[in-house]
Design a protein with these regions (language model features):
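N-terminal secretory signal peptides that target proteins for export/translocation
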Residues: 1-5
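Glycine-rich nucleophile elbow surrounding the catalytic serine of serine-hydrolase chemistry
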Residues: 195-204
Length: 281
């Protein structure tokens, strides 16, 4: 009798648990009311392409003007984090539909000082089944053709910190919580894959917030910023300060000659001639 009763109670508990698990997931639109410390969600919209949905394409350095299209349904969440007085870290989190999700998260960075969401990378990642997110690193550049990005944010300490490391961390923390609310379970593995300043962001994540990711790819990291910027400015002023009239101006037509000379001098240093310089020292 006791055995039958225990089996009955176990079955009842199991049936009661089913709706609890089901309701742990949230609809895309309900994520707009999700509460996360110092985070405001401004949009949560289900995107159902038919056949394709075209994403925004900021006019910024390093950005292609080719249209960005997505062909799989997903939940698009936008918001911002304000962890400090002058912080406003804009971000977007894209979540593939549950039956297309690979249970992984892929964070992505941005090049240089660019203050834009990396929509092209978001589109690429969502097609592969990743929950994915990108931030503007705490500032927004102009979106006017022919105009250079603004730099006023560089005089605001909070925004410099956001660009330097806090923006990516805040975005990752928010993305994890948004993802968990949407799918009703935590991310199995979290990765970072980005290059240039995104590679530098990878290194700062690894150094300051090692708990954010299970694996990190830091492509051509633009680190050692003080030296990097000093050399960049010197080379720019020396080579193109006065355009073609600069004493050190090097015309584009001679680039292939320089490229060949560098390969001839350095390619074999790593033991293999393959047109790739693995050891520039």
């Amino acid at each position: 009798m006791k055995y039958r009763l225990s089996v009955f109670l176990t079955l009842v508990a199991g049936f009661l648990l089913i709706p609890m698990i089901a309701t742990a997931q949230q609809s895309c639109e309900s994520l707009a009311s999700l509460k996360i410390p110092h985070v405001t969600i401004t949009m949560a919209t289900a995107i159902d392409p038919s056949p394709d949905w075209e994403a925004p394409n900021p006019k910024a350095p390093f950005w292609s003007s080719e249209p960005i299209t997505v062909s799989v349904p997903f939940c698009r969440v936008a918001g911002f984090s304000a962890p400090a007085r002058d912080s406003h870290i804009g971000f977007e989190v894209w979540l593939p539909r549950a039956d297309h999700w690979n249970e992984k998260y892929l964070g992505i960075g941005t090049p240089g000082f660019v203050g834009f969401i990396a929509y092209r990378a978001l589109a690429r990642n969502i097609q592969k089944g990743y929950a994915t997110a990108s931030s503007d690193t705490g500032h927004v550049d102009v979106d006017t053709p022919g105009e250079a990005p603004t730099a006023e944010w560089g005089a605001i300490p909070d925004k410099v910190i956001d660009w330097g490391h806090r923006g990516q961390h805040e975005t990752t923390v928010a993305a994890r919580q948004i993802s968990r609310a949407y799918y009703g379970k935590p991310i199995k593995y979290a990765y970072w894959n980005s290059c240039h300043e995104g590679g530098n962001q990878a290194l700062t994540e690894l150094q300051r917030y090692p708990e954010d990711f299970d694996g990190i790819v830091a492509g051509d990291p633009a680190h050692y910023i003080t030296h990097l910027q000093s050399v960049t400015e010197y080379v720019t002023l020396t080579l193109v300060g006065d355009g073609p009239d600069s004493p050190g101006f090097f015309p584009h037509a001679k680039y292939p000659v320089l490229h060949r000379a560098v390969l001839d001098a350095c390619d074999a240093l790593d033991g293999v001639r393959d047109n790739i310089i693995d050891d520039p020292t």
